[in-house]
Amino acid sequence: MSTSNGTIVEIELPCKLSTCDANLLQRCEGRVLFLPFVRARVLLKDVDYKSFYIAGTEPDTLSLLSTFKTRFAAVITRALPGRMSAVVLGMGSIPNGLALQNTGPFDLCNGDTVCLMPPIFPNVCCRIRLESIDTELLFPVTVPTRLANEILAKTLSRAIEAIGRGQMPPPTSRESETIMYNGRSYTISPTLHSLDAAESTVRTLLLNMIFAINEGNMILYTMIPTLLTLGASDGYINALVGLETATRAVGQLIRIPNPPPLQDAWRRYPVYEALSAWITMTLNLGNVLSLHPLLKVCTFDGPANIKAGDLCPVIANWY
């Protein structure tokens, strides 16, 4: 249901849910669930842990991260008998006073933008088991944006290492990755259950990175002769190429010819098209590599630091 206070989704709970499990859900207010679709009413089985399975295979860190990008994040606002209410992020406004639960091991500070990542910290519990209905829920970890890229890079490097190792056993036991934040060290342990999925993800990523780097270099190579030629008559370009040193050195050795006219320059601009295509490709690659923060911590009269497990007021960060 879309209102002035945001898009609110009702998650229906089974009637067999026990009182103990209902109390567990009440403690999940402020946590995030990922919806496969946005409707007025959603079943609990649509957002439970088994909904992330791919062909009956338990998801690993990379597959969860990929699924998070394709689903709709929603913050649980109320857990009532028979249903839960959640506000969908990234669609319109959010209600005033929306609170996010800090599910990560880090303290969130006022002004921090928050990313949502799969559970990768061994000492942080991000699952709850509802025994009465045989259901398990998975919640993402809240991570400050300035740490998210480092964690993602280390997760991808672990996947590349696992793929390169193949079937050969590792010579020594692989130690857990460690990151530093505010003077403290934290251990991350990404899981790689399905190497086929990891290989597909990492292979696509690396091929696009290599292609983008190669295309960027080729565009630069085509522009270097023009840059040096213009440097013979333009003082500003002289400064750009190294205070006239490069231009003077090349001019003393060879006579740079005038650049030929661009092919079909009278009706199109090949250099512009190449640059436009390359910028678009790098932007798409950046969207794959980056984790977009949807929320920003904004405390007015409360504590500036939000401890793990506490609720913090947030505002939208997707505009």
From Swiss-Prot:
InterPro entries found in the cross-reference section: Herpes_capsid_2
Localization of this protein: Virion; Host nucleus
Q: What is its main location?
A: virion
Q: Please, which domain of life does this record's source organism belong to?
A: Viruses
CC annotations in GO: host cell nucleus; viral capsid
Query: Which key words are in the record?
Result: Capsid protein, Host nucleus, Virion
Listed GO MF terms? structural molecule activity
Family (UniProt): Belongs to the herpesviridae TRX2 protein family.
What exactly does this protein do? Answer: Structural component of the T=16 icosahedral capsid. The capsid is composed of pentamers and hexamers of major capsid protein/MCP, which are linked together by heterotrimers called triplexes. These triplexes are formed by a single molecule of triplex protein 1/TRX1 and two copies of triplex protein 2/TRX2. Additionally, TRX1 is required for efficient transport of TRX2 to the nucleus, which is the site of capsid assembly.
Q: How does it assemble?
A: Interacts with TRX1 and major capisd protein/MCP.
Name assigned to this protein:
Triplex capsid protein 2
**Organism whose genome encodes this protein:** Gallid herpesvirus 2 (strain Chicken/Md5/ATCC VR-987)
